[in-house]
């Protein structure tokens, strides 16, 4: 949608999987001329500069790229939200956000590259209940996403798990 509207919050992303795991990822945002690259076990770079994810320890006050927060989450801090979930995940990878979370079904190809980019920068990436996300499944869908600083992952899961389970039934 951002591409169609002439906004900057979109990118092209490519990921290489071996089995159920992403081992190489690249994302390019043409408008901002940012190129993220990650190799499993070798870290993440953006335009050649090594990235390090947020090291936040306190959940309250965490920076979240969103347009609005539910009343129960008003202890969090809103920051600019690009439309692309992958671009939001790179915000955690480069310490411009502390938490990206969704409670909806999504295709693995939308997050595969950003998943490795965020993890190799030091972030934690799981589904909305804290479970591992596997790739190359027969049904390439997962419910929800948490991408965040390691120090707030448990609190994020605690905050979202009940909501996720209520949606899933």
Region spans (language model):
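An extended, acidic
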Residues: 52-169
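DPxDG-like acidic metal-binding loop motif
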Residues: 1-45
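Local beta-strand/beta-hairpin segments that build beta-sheet-rich folds
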Residues: 23, 51-52
């Amino acid at each position: 949608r951002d591409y169609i509207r002439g906004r900057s919050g979109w990118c092209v992303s490519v990921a290489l999987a071996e089995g159920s795991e992403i081992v190489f990822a690249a994302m390019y945002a043409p408008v901002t001329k940012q190129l993220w690259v990650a190799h499993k076990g070798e870290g993440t770079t953006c335009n050649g500069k090594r990235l390090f994810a947020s090291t936040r320890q306190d959940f309250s006050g965490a920076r979240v790229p969103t347009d609005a927060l539910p009343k129960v989450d008003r202890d969090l801090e809103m920051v600019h939200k690009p439309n692309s979930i992958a671009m939001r995940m790179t915000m955690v990878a480069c310490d411009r956000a502390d938490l990206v979370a969704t409670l909806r079904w999504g295709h693995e190809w939308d997050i595969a590259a950003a998943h490795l980019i965020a993890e190799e920068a030091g972030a934690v990436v799981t589904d909305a209940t804290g479970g591992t996300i596997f790739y190359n499944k027969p049904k390439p869908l997962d419910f929800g996403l948490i991408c965040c600083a390691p120090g707030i992952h448990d609190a994020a899961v605690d905050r979202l798990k009940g909501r996720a389970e209520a949606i899933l039934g």
